[in-house]
Swiss-Prot record:
Protein name: UPF0761 membrane protein Ppha_1623
Pfam families membership: Virul_fac_BrkB
Subcellular location: Cell inner membrane
Predominant cellular place of this UniProt entry's protein: membrane
Segments traversing the membrane: 52-72, 108-128, 148-168, 189-209, 216-233, 252-272
HAMAP family (UniProt xref): UPF0761
The keyword Ligase appears for this protein: no
Keywords (A to Z) from UniProt: Cell inner membrane, Cell membrane, Membrane, Transmembrane, Transmembrane helix
Family designation: Belongs to the UPF0761 family.
Domain of life: Bacteria
Example of a GO cellular component annotation carried by this entry: plasma membrane
InterPro entries: UPF0761_bac, Virul_fac_BrkB
Topological relation to the membrane, as annotated: Multi-pass membrane protein
Amino acid sequence: MGEKERRGQNPKTESNAVELVSCMRVFIPFFWKNFIHDRIFLGAGSLAFQTLLSIVPILAVILSILNVFVVFTPFKRSLEDFLVQNFMPGAGNVLNHYLTDFIGKTASVPILGGVFLFIIALFLISTVDHTLNEIWEVHAPRKALQGFTLYWTVLTLGPVLIGSSLAASSYVWYMVFTDGPLLELKTRLLSFFPFINSVAAFFLLYMLVPNRRVRFVHAFSGALLAALLFELSKRWFTFYITHIATFEHIYGALSVIPMLFFWVYLGWIVVLTGAEFVFCLGALKPVERIADVFSPLRGVPEILSVLAHIWNGQKSGNAMNMKKMLKVIEGLTPSGLRKVIDILLQNGLLHVTVNGDLAISRDLYTMTLYDLYAIIPSGFWGDENGLLISGGNSVHLKTISKGVTECLKNSMDLPLAPLLEDINQQPE
C-alpha cells in the first residue's frame, strides 16, 4: 500500500484536482481575454439603452398575443403582475405603477401603432441576436427569411409558452398541493421557481440564438452560471436600493429612471457573461504536452500564412479583413486568427485602415524571419510554456541559450518578403 493511501489520500482524486487546477489556469485567462476583447460592458450598455426603449412595446406585444387565446384570459392578470413586479427588484411601487399604466394604455393603440410596437420589439431581438453571434464569432449573417422566422417565433410562441406554463402550474398548485404536508413542499418549490425559470430561459438563449452548433453541456453550464449571477445581482441590487439609495438622494422623484437603467445594464452584463462562458467552453481546446507536439517553428507558419494573404491582398488592391481571411485560410479558427492579428497589431506589423481592413506597416524586405519569430510571445502556445521553470543563474544553460539563439538568427536571416511570395505562389 502506498504512502498516500495509508494517509487516506486517493491518488486518482488528487490527480483530478491537479488537472482541474491546470484547466482553470488556462481557462480563466482565456475567458478574461475574450471578455475584454468582445467589450461586454459596452455591449451591455447598448442593449440596456435599447431595452429601455422597448420595455413597454415588448410587454404590450406579449399581453396582446395572450389576449388572442381565450383560454389564457384568467391568467392574464397574474402574468401581468408577475412581469411587472419582478422586472426590477427593490424598486417599490413607483415603477410598477408607471409600467402598469403604460401597458393599460396600449390596449387602445390603433392597428398601425400596434405594428410599430411589434417592429420595435423585433429590433431588440435582432440586436440581441447580433450581439450573441458576435461573441460566437459568427460572421455569416442569418438569411433574412430565417432571421424573421426566428424573431417571429420568439414573439408569438414565447407568450403562448409562458401562458401554458402558468396554466399548468396553477392547475398543479391548486389541485394537488392544497392541504396537508404538501403545502410545505409547495412553498419550497415556489421558492426555487424563479431560479429554474432563469436557467431554462438562459439555456434556450445560449442554445438556439447562436448561428452555430452549441453543445448541450456547454449551454446548460452557462445557463447555470448566468442564473446564479442573476440571483446574486438581484440580491445585491435590492440591498443597494434599500440601504444606500444614492440614486434617490441625487435624483429625487426621477431616481426611477437611472435605477431602471442600472438594473437593466446589470442584467445584460449577466446575459453576455454567460454567453462568453459558453463560447469559451467550446472554443478552448485542451493543451497537449510539449513532448508530443514540439516544433521549433510553432506558430510561425500560421503567422506567415496570415501575413501572406494580407500582403497579397494589399498588392492586388483587394484589402483583407478577418471575415475574408476566415473564408480563404483553412484550418485556422476565428480565435486563432484573432490571436495572430493581435500579435501583429501590437508589434506594429499591421495597422487597421479607416475602412476596417488590415494593411502591412513594416518593410518586409528588411525584416527577417528571426525578427518575426522574436515577437511571438510565450503565451501564444497556450499554457504549456508556463510549465517551464527557470534554470536560475546556471552558466551552462546561459551558454546553451546563447548558442541556440545565434543558431536561430543565422538560420532565420531571411527577408520576409520572398517567403510570403513563395507562400502565395503555392496552390490553394
